[in-house]
Amino acid sequence: MESTEKLTDTNAILAYLYETFPLCFIAEGETKPLKIGLFQDLAERLADDSKVSKTQLRIALRRYTSSWRYLKCVKAGAQRIDLDGNACGELEQEHIDHAAATLKESQDKAKAKRVAQAKSANPAAKTAKKPVKKPVAKRPKPAQSSKPAKEPVVAENLTPAVLTELKPNQRVNVKLGKAPVAGVILDIKKEDVQVQLDSGLTIKVRAEHILL
């Protein structure tokens, strides 16, 4: 005894219709508008076919006729066809306008969805960059920027540094002109000491120009 498995997947049912009615349901390329009332003809033609139910046929037919490929074929001058591919009259303008409106609405929804997805992805990228930029923006504006002008008051208590006493990240004063300027040692290479002043300026000086 042979048992026929009922098709439930819409794509599988469409594939079955492409195979059974190739002149009506076109799998690839430009389609043709279907005859009004074609569902009834389809149900009668497949009444003895246990593979598909009327409900599944209706769903598959709706999927086929709502696709962009089908809606694009509903245009002026096109002929409707029956299950055997026979012409059944030209389309009415009302149906052409309805198909065009449905196609535009569907395409607009798809476009809006793509835009929304793109926007939802961009904020994440922007917020990921902000934490990196914040520390850089704060560096040029240290709270101590107004203090260097007052440092000369204690200049009498400062003494020239010895190279061996210096180390990176150490707070020091650099002798520039008449008044020493406060800063932080960034790096020491041989006899050259790189210092970042509180003003944000980075300079390279000899150890004898550094005061402690």
Swiss-Prot record:
Keyword Coiled coil: no
Cellular localization per UniProt: Cytoplasm
Keyword set, alphabetical order: Chaperone, Cytoplasm, RNA-binding
Cellular component GO terms, alphabetical: cytosol
Entry's Gene Ontology molecular function annotations: RNA strand annealing activity; RNA strand-exchange activity
Region (Disordered): 107-153
Record-level GO BP terms: post-transcriptional regulation of gene expression
Pfam families: ProQ, ProQ_C
NCBIfam families: PRK04950.1
Protein name: RNA chaperone ProQ
Organism encoding this protein: Shewanella pealeana (strain ATCC 700345 / ANG-SQ1)
